[in-house]
Amino acid sequence: MAQKINKDTDIVVTSGCVTSYSYPKYGFNLEALGDEATLTFGELRAIAMSSDKVALHKFYIMPTEILEEEFDMNDLIKQLRMEKPYNEARKVFGLDEDDIITADSFIDFIKDSTVDELKEALKNPNLSGRLSDITVGLYRENEVHVDKLRVVLEHNNIDLGAFISDTID
């Protein structure tokens, strides 16, 4: 059996949210997509083993670096029991099993995917929220075509005309 990660080991987490994401219990507030905070493995494990695990499984926050040379990210993912959502995301994004999932993984997939690939990826309940949120953010920055926005809005049962009207107002 692999050695366990010490509860005091620092782990860098990255925000997967376009808007702010905070976790007051552990004293961090991530203001924008890609912002980073450092938590201990003990804190991250407490999140992963509680009802708050949705933050990790749905990629609101993503561990991106373990500050201990003897462990790699796959050790961390296994010890946090997050193999399933991470393996699914790697498959959808076309990443290798050792690749780290970051906010850029979502951005690159959204920009580089076809409309059909994005539509298929939105069927994954662990990815759909972040894909939707980030696609809307990229559209607002004129970085993705309206067809991708349309797919996201349809997936979320939002009318394109109403969305555009709300955005203009």
Model-derived segments and spans:
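Compact, well-ordered interaction domains used in eukaryotic information-processing assemblies
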Residues: A2-P85
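Charge/polar-rich, low-complexity and marginally structured segments
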Residues: E83-D169
